[in-house]
């Protein structure tokens, strides 16, 4: 029931563009595994073996801490409507921050979001689909606006202060670039 690909076929690129949510998983050799839901129309397919997503401020910064030490990353998408399917993208990622040269090239590809803190650039070495027949059917209602409103109210300086206060280490004490 599963299929493996060495790149993202056109039909799966279309599937990705239609999804409202995806999940990202990372870990270091000795840390907890982090699995986070993402949305906000923050992901772009940059080619058959490359995707990037704009990461906004959240309650932690686990993904960035993990990628500095171990760049392995998995993204998962699942169909909640229509035909069932689960899509996983496996690869190695790099965290790109606002002071990195690549930021200037990649950031214009995204809708600007308040509190944006990194872009994760994922080079994909394996694509897998599986049936997804056990995934329930859900209806998309809309985006949550609380995070954008929170970041806009704090302003850029307030968000940076929040990063310094709360995002300098992961749950396992791994450093981030916000120390």
Segments (PLM) and residue ranges:
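Binding-site signature for planar aromatic cofactors or substrates
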Residues: 1-179
């Amino acid at each position: 029931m599963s299929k493996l690909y060495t790149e993202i076929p056109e039909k799966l690129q279309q599937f990705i563009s239609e999804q409202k949510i995806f999940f990202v998983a990372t870990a270091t050799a000795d840390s907890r595994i982090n699995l986070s839901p993402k949305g906000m129309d923050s992901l772009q397919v940059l080619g058959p073996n490359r995707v990037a997503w704009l990461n906004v401020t959240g309650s932690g910064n686990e993904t960035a801490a993990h990628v500095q030490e171990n760049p392995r990353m998995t993204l998962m998408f699942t169909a909640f409507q229509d035909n069932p399917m689960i899509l996983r993208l496996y690869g190695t990622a790099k965290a790109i921050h606002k002071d990195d040269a690549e930021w200037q090239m990649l950031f214009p590809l995204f809708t600007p979001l308040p509190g944006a803190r990194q872009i994760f650039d994922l080079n994909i070495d394996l694509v897998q689909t599986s049936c997804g027949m056990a995934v329930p059917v859900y209806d998309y209602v809309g985006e949550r606006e609380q995070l954008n409103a929170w970041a806009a109210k704090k302003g850029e300086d307030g968000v940076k202060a929040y990063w310094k206060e709360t995002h300098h280490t992961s749950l396992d004490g791994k450093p981030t670039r916000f120390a």
